[in-house]
Amino acid sequence: MASKEGAPAHGNPAHLLPPSWRKTVGLWLEEDTPSFDYGGFVVGDGPAEARLLAKSAGIVAGVPFFDEVFKQLDCTVEWHVKEGDEVGVQEKKQHVATVKGPVRCLLLGERVALNALARCSGIATKAHALLSLLRQAGYKNTLAGTRKTTPGFRLVEKYGMLVGGCDPHRQDLSAMTMLKDNHIWACSGSIPTAVAAAKASAGFAVKVEVECQSEEEANTAIEAGADVVMLDNFTGDGVKVASKSLKDRWGRGTNARALIEVSGGLNEDNVSDYVCDDIDIISSSSIHQGVKHVDFSLKVIPKDANAHGKMGDGESADT
């Protein structure tokens, strides 16, 4: 089982999902079957059972989405592992869940459910791996993802980050005001002007973060009232020098005027170079962009397994 950090350490991440998420699952099914289901017609409505097999190693994440796909199709899912468990390590094709229902409904939901589960699990696996690497390097603070998510699939990807023990970062543009270089340039290059406008419009409840290219810009942003400063595309040594200087000036811990985030090109190969006590947040899109999926397969059990030989080996076409 993956070590519990972040949201999973305090409760069930599924309880964070908004009421609209079930509608999103329904839209996935509509996208996949906008008209006649010819394959479903062939197999009919007879009762059937299918096994969900984990064919590669990883952290299981996305259980609510998988379950909801089949719930909307009048099927039931019984899990033999828990969300957050590591699967596929000791057993190549580990039986992780059983799905029961009308055979055409099993096949109707198969690809949609597998896509969500595989993607979400891949992100949770990568998040857990990167977090473990940072903990081994002595980093004790927050690892976060980014907003560089797949349009229409953000909820699943952010959920995977949570299950993997990471902070999902801001959910959307309304969750926090992040002033990037383009925002500053659009305000005649003035960080104080941009921060003042953000504070005036968003009010006290919304934090303001400023992307900074230098220690000087970070000082200006904090002085202007930024709640978070992002040191963007710094070198590892540059981050350590700048973050210490900023903390020395603006305070640490509960006395800090602002949090310090580090981002820009961080991945498993270099993130350990950035570890120091004065960084509050390390964020990386490598947690969720270009991440290898965890490979799952759903295999329907033949009505008479003995007559048809053993159940399929779990290999299937990608379509």
Show the residue positions of the predicted features.
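Acidic/glycine-rich phosphate/pyrophosphate-binding loops and surrounding catalytic core
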Residues: 2-224, 228, 240-245, 254, ...
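Short, charged, intrinsically disordered terminal tails
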Residues: 243, 286-319
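Glycine-centered loop/turn positions within well-structured domains
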Residues: 237
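Glycine/alanine-rich phosphate-binding loops at beta-alpha junctions
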Residues: 234
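Active-site T/S-Asp motif of two-component receiver
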Residues: 231
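Short acidic, glycine/proline-enriched helix-loop-strand junctions
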Residues: 249-258, 303-311
